[in-house]
Structures are given as structure tokens and as C-alpha cells.
Amino acid sequence: MRVIFTGGGTGGHIYPIMAIIERLKERGISKNDEILFVGTQKGLESKIVPAAGVNFETIQIQGFNRKHPLKNFETIKLFFQATKSARKILQEFKPDVVLGTGGYVSGAMVYEAAKMHIPTMIHESNSVVGLANKFLGHYVDKICYTFDDAAKEFPEKKKLVKTGNPRSQQVLGLHEDKVNLQKELGLNPQMPTVLVFGGSRGALAINRIMLKSLMELKKKPYQIIWATGTYYFDSVQKKLEGVDYGDNIKILPYIQNMPALLPEMTCVVSRSGATSIAEFTALGVPVILIPSPNVTHNHQMKNALDLQKAGAALVIPEDDLNPNNFVSSIDHILLDEKYANEMSEASKALGVPDASDQVIKVMEEISR
């Protein structure tokens, strides 16, 4: 099966595609030369995709400027130019199906494919539908989604298929070869442990609250792994020069093998991006979510509230974050085993362990 995947800008648009590609190859459905990822040169995909050995092409496009509407004339012009580039790629590659995950590049690629009567589908990872996917919902053959709230935003009900996030299945496979990373970090594998992180680059608000809470956390009968993010690591280390923050806290720039570490955690403190949530629910890890307020349509807050409603997460809005509610939330999970187990079961109930296979099934059904 020849497939064009398209999406970009953020990891939430890229990682589901990478998970599907991995599964297509594992099952022998598509060889490497039958798979193409179309993104932009400036997006995160331009680094991640080629590094994974996946064929990659780019088209030039930009998003709408909400602060300066007059600049959107250029955006519209670029969109129509991008559809011409998309048509050329489609004619040359001759895909059996085109799948988009969001981002403006997917808008051009999937729209043009639909106009050419090539089978098309989209996948929405968040609880709030992005602009590109909302637009494409009218034209595609199928709409795959993760959160029920997202499904409500699409009027095309017959096209909807609940598949979950493909990253769920991938992360389950990645952690099968268990290694005890806590032991490698000099921690006690028998003690309750919380992982605190804000993504690969880190999150300023999470790092700030950790700095304010360290003296209280060092007294606790549990362990903390704090991944500051590569961007903030040096500044955090500088602020902690000469500070005794205890033996129960390990500070790292980032976690290299996150899928291997997550199953060992009693609890995780994190942002609430779609990819992270897919990982947590696949593994049934209780989470304290601090949604980023700096995202389109506040979708991280809505993602987080969906988990909290299901009993799988505690949510602390960034504006409400203080050392008292931060530490007490961690205590609530790590010092109450019954509550932690209930959260874990609620989280697992939301996960879809065969999400990639479910998306591939839809691809096979509509492919020409």
C-alpha cells in the first residue's frame, strides 16, 4: 500500500504518523519506498522524519496570523501555491491513500488529494479539533479521532471512527523489554517515585514550581525524577549551586528512554499534549497535569479535563499553581496506594492498545 502522510509543526501531529509508519513496516503492509511524509522545512518534522529514515518532502505554507489579519492575504496566496506543489507530489508518488494529522501543510495536501479523488482521511489527536482538520472534515472519506469531545465538532457523523492515538500502541511495544532505569539513576526501585517533566525543551512554569517546592519535597518518603528540559537545565543547575536538595531528588536535562521509565513511575507531573496523554493512558500511569496556556484554542486544558473527568488525572491550571497545591497533589497520589491504583485503572480504560492497527484498518478499507 502506497501512503502519503502529512502533518507538522508540533510533535502532536508528527508522532502519531511515525507510530503508524512503524506498524505498517512491522506488518509488511508497506515498504519504506511506499511511504512518503510531506511536511514543511521549518517544522519539527524536518528533523524527526529524515532522522528516522522515512522519505520526506516539503511544501511551503504558513498559518493564519490572528494578531495581524492583513498578513493573511499572503497566507491564502501561499495556500493555493502549496496545493499546486501538493498536486505535483501526488501525481508523481501515486498514493493509494493520504492521511493528515493536522497543521497547515496537511490542509493543502489532503485537500488536493480529495480533489483528485484519491482516498483521504484525517486523524485528530486532541479534544479540540484544529483548524486544518475542521476544514478537511468536509472533504475526506474518514475521520479518525481520540477524544469524544473532538467527534462532536465534526458534522459528518458517518465518517467518524474512534481509533485512539497510534502512539499508545507504539509506547506499549517500546516498554516490553524492561530495564530498571531507577536503579541506573541511583534510586530505590521499591520506593514510590514521581517523574516531573515539561517535554524535551522543558516548561518554565513546571521548573519554577519545582524550585519553589524542593525544600518541602526533600522531606518526603518518595523519590522524584525531575527532567528540566535541555533548554532550562543549565539555568536550573546554576540556581541550585550550593543547595542541599536531598538524596531523593534526581535532576536531569531530559529522559532518553521515556517509554521504559514510565511503567516504573507511581505518578507523573506533565503538560497535557496529545502524545503525552496517549503514552500515560496506554500504560495506566496516574498523572498530575499542568496544561500549557500557550496553545491554540486552549486544547491542552480540554485534554486534561477529559482525563480528570474520567478519574485518571488531577489538573492544576498554571495560573493556580503554588507550592501548596503542587506538593499536596503529589502526596495525594504517592501516599495513598488505593487512590493511585484507582487512577491507574481509570487511565488504562481510556487507552487504546491497538490504536495503530485500528487506523491502518481504516486506511486499508478506503485505499484504492
UniProtKB/Swiss-Prot annotation:
Predominant location category: membrane
GO cellular component, one term: plasma membrane
InterPro entries: GlcNAc_MurG (IPR006009), Glyco_trans_28_C (IPR007235), GlycoTrans_28_N (IPR004276)
GO molecular function (one): undecaprenyldiphospho-muramoylpentapeptide beta-N-acetylglucosaminyltransferase activity
Membrane topology: Peripheral membrane protein
Keyword Cell wall biogenesis/degradation: yes
Residues reported to bind UDP-N-acetyl-alpha-D-glucosamine: T10, G11, G12, N126, S200, I255, Q300
Reactions it catalyzes: Mur2Ac(oyl-L-Ala-gamma-D-Glu-L-Lys-D-Ala-D-Ala)-di-trans,octa-cis-undecaprenyl diphosphate + UDP-N-acetyl-alpha-D-glucosamine = beta-D-GlcNAc-(1->4)-Mur2Ac(oyl-L-Ala-gamma-D-Glu-L-Lys-D-Ala-D-Ala)-di-trans,octa-cis-undecaprenyl diphosphate + UDP + H(+)
Pathway involvement of the protein, from the record: Cell wall biogenesis; peptidoglycan biosynthesis
One Pfam family per UniProt: Glyco_transf_28
Entry's Gene Ontology BP terms: carbohydrate metabolic process; cell division; cell wall organization; lipid glycosylation; peptidoglycan biosynthetic process; regulation of cell shape
Subcellular location: Cell membrane
Annotated EC: 2.4.1.227
Keywords linked to the UniProt accession: Cell cycle, Cell division, Cell membrane, Cell shape, Cell wall biogenesis/degradation, Glycosyltransferase, Membrane, Peptidoglycan synthesis, Transferase
Xref: Gene3D superfamilies: Glycogen Phosphorylase B
Coiled coil: none
Similarity annotation: Belongs to the glycosyltransferase 28 family. MurG subfamily.
PANTHER family membership: GLYCOSYLTRANSFERASE, UDP-N-ACETYLGLUCOSAMINE--N-ACETYLMURAMYL-(PENTAPEPTIDE) PYROPHOSPHORYL-UNDECAPRENOL N-ACETYLGLUCOSAMINE TRANSFERASE 1
Role played: Cell wall formation. Catalyzes the transfer of a GlcNAc subunit on undecaprenyl-pyrophosphoryl-MurNAc-pentapeptide (lipid intermediate I) to form undecaprenyl-pyrophosphoryl-MurNAc-(pentapeptide)GlcNAc (lipid intermediate II).
Name of the protein in question: UDP-N-acetylglucosamine--N-acetylmuramyl-(pentapeptide) pyrophosphoryl-undecaprenol N-acetylglucosamine transferase
